[in-house]
Amino acid sequence: MPTVGLTGPLCSGKDAVVEYLETKHGFNAIFRLPQLNEDGEYIYRTGDLVLGSVDDLISYLTPRWRERFVINGIHSPRLLSALLKRPFFLLVYIDAPIMLRFNRYKTYSSLANTTLEEFCSIQDAAAFQSDNAGTRHRALANLLINNDSNIKLHLWEKLQKADLLNPNRFRPSWDSYFMEMASLAAKRSNCMKRRVGCVLVRGNRVIATGYNGTPRGATNCNEGGCPRCNSASSCGKELDTCLCLHAEENALLEAGRERVGNNAILYCDTCPCLTCSVKITQLGIKEVVYHTSYNMDSHTASLLQAAGVQLRQYIPPENSIF
């Protein structure tokens, strides 16, 4: 494990990435051959082995998921669709500034007279005018590498920083998983001031979720339901007139003391306020994990510490763009 698929525009540096993975991490390269099979599908090669179709390639990779492979150029929509379902696959989009790519393109003797306009037309056709358009690949990619230098060592340093073999890039940790759920819950928020989401967990099982907004039956905050949030009042001010329930309150109310039980963990994409922290301690939450700081963090930390509740900030994996 894993299989890395490389995609990206012409002359972006995919060959250099293959060289890095082969040299530094012992990957086996898989290349697309220029000819097609009788069904019009691409043919692939790894070492001396020729794989005559997408199905052959998938059948070859699946039982070898413990081995390391890099596919240089994903050109088949069917191949990409099949690989994206596999837990051992990582799609990496390699990009570079267009003038850098143009100058690389012209280094091929037979293409030295290509104009920039001609190169842009070739690039646009590949990016926008096919079922396998590059723009779609960019949207689906797990990682984006900007190869903005002609010095190979600079690209290799970026690849090392990207840590392609990090298991969290293939299957998220519990912290990443539940924080993503909290962020998803936040998208349901109707609060005009900020979106906040929360997930309550025990034994790695979700007990309840919550997001902030006006209570059941009331007009949504983003439809004028809370005058305070629809005004220009500052953060942390006039909270006594706010009609919105906080995400943590919603999750705790949904769960109740009996369902919370012992050793529950509360994940919230924003550090709980002091008022929510009081309720968190009362329900016996063991740990609070948050992502973004809030202006009451020190007060929250003091209260939770006094109550024996662990407070921890979640630091997500390194950015997906390098």
UniProtKB/Swiss-Prot annotation:
GO biological process per UniProt: cytidine deamination; dTMP biosynthetic process; dUMP biosynthetic process
In this chain, Zn(2+) is annotated as bound at 246, 273, 276
> Which compartments does it reside in?
Cytoplasm; Nucleus
What positions does the domain CMP/dCMP-type deaminase occupy?
A: 173-311
User: Could you give one GO CC term from the UniProt record?
Assistant: cytosol
Gene3D superfamilies in the record, alphabetically? Cytidine Deaminase, domain 2, P-loop containing nucleotide triphosphate hydrolases
Write the Enzyme Commission number(s) for this entry.
3.5.4.12
Keyword tRNA-binding on this protein? Answer: no
Needed co-factor(s): Zn(2+)
Q: Does the keyword NADP feature in the UniProt annotation?
A: no
Active site positions, chain numbering: 248
Q: Which UniProt keywords apply?
A: Cytoplasm, Hydrolase, Metal-binding, Nucleotide biosynthesis, Nucleus, Zinc
What molecular function does GO assign, one term?
zinc ion binding
Q: Which reaction does it catalyse?
A: dCMP + H2O + H(+) = dUMP + NH4(+)
What is the similarity comment for this entry?
Belongs to the cytidine and deoxycytidylate deaminase family.
The free-text function statement in the UniProt record for this protein reads: Supplies the nucleotide substrate for thymidylate synthetase.
Protein name, as recorded:
Deoxycytidylate deaminase
Species in which this protein is naturally found: Schizosaccharomyces pombe (strain 972 / ATCC 24843) (Fission yeast)
